[in-house]
Amino acid sequence: YIRGSIKHKLLHGHNAPNRKKHIDRIVEKLSCTTISTPYQWFLLGTAVHYIADCFTFAHNEFFTGGMAQHMKYEMLLQPIFHNFVNGLKEPQNKYKTYYFNLSFYHKMYQNENRSFLTDCKYIVSSTEKLLDSLELVKDEVPLLSTQINLAK
């Protein structure tokens, strides 16, 4: 049954090529209002999840493994990601960008070395860009991504 009518619905925004329309639709809904209801927070969480998937090696076309390798990659990435985020310190300089271009970020990501660290850097940085573009990050709150160098 999975190979039939629900196959593509399962992937939704979970892979990089498929993410744009799903994330754009969510951002459009959220940018028109203050996020205050449980449903709006759920939508924001969904967008963040899709962005994280976009910058996860196993969710991209260049990943050639099967589902078992996909699951193994994500299991190995999870503790590395937690350690990565926990290791970020509050930056001294404040930084704010109002422009979020996921396609540009993803093109940069595709040209990087494939590694857990690359995934972590792009997931954190792109998620902050999304939150910033929705003005959920206040001016007085320094962004963690100022510590992450995405340039080659």
Question: Language-model features: where?
Answer:
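N-terminal leader/auxiliary helical segments
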Residues: 1-152
